[in-house]
């Protein structure tokens, strides 16, 4: 199911660096992680849905690129974020 505006606002509030920050790498990664986690159960039930799986893989690769950027620019923030989100390195 799609993420509601309230859920999105809650995620932004939890990961923003300053008031009104919606575009920092941390916020974008957290939002992508929430979307990925929402889509994952769909593929357990619908194993042949390859069209949507491609969209999921695009989200995962976008998150990976943002994580690589964050690791390059702010290594300590990267480590803190992956532990908060429960991601592997």
Swiss-Prot record:
SMART domains per the record? Ribosomal_S15
Q: Which Pfam families match?
A: Ribosomal_S15 (PF00312)
Is Flavoprotein included in the keywords of this UniProt record?
Answer: no
One GO term describing the cellular component = cytosolic small ribosomal subunit
Q: Which UniProt keywords apply?
A: Ribonucleoprotein, Ribosomal protein, RNA-binding, rRNA-binding
Q: Which PANTHER family match?
A: RIBOSOMAL PROTEIN S15, BACTERIAL AND ORGANELLAR, SMALL RIBOSOMAL SUBUNIT PROTEIN US15M
Record note on quaternary structure: Part of the 30S ribosomal subunit. Forms a bridge to the 50S subunit in the 70S ribosome, contacting the 23S rRNA.
User: What role is this protein assigned?
Assistant: One of the primary rRNA binding proteins, it binds directly to 16S rRNA where it helps nucleate assembly of the platform of the 30S subunit by binding and bridging several RNA helices of the 16S rRNA. Forms an intersubunit bridge (bridge B4) with the 23S rRNA of the 50S subunit in the ribosome.
Q: What is this protein called?
A: Small ribosomal subunit protein uS15
Q: Which organism is it from?
A: Chromobacterium violaceum (strain ATCC 12472 / DSM 30191 / JCM 1249 / CCUG 213 / NBRC 12614 / NCIMB 9131 / NCTC 9757 / MK)
Please name the gene that encodes this protein: rpsO
């Amino acid at each position: 199911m799609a993420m509601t505006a309230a859920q999105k606002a809650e995620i932004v509030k939890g990961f923003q660096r300053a008031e009104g920050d919606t575009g920092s790498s941390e916020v974008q990664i957290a939002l992508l992680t929430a979307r990925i986690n929402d889509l994952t159960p769909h593929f357990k039930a619908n194993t042949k849905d390859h069209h949507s799986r491609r969209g999921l893989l695009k989200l995962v690769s976008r998150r990976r690129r943002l994580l690589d950027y964050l690791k390059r620019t702010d290594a300590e923030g990267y480590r803190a974020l992956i532990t908060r989100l429960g991601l592997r390195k």
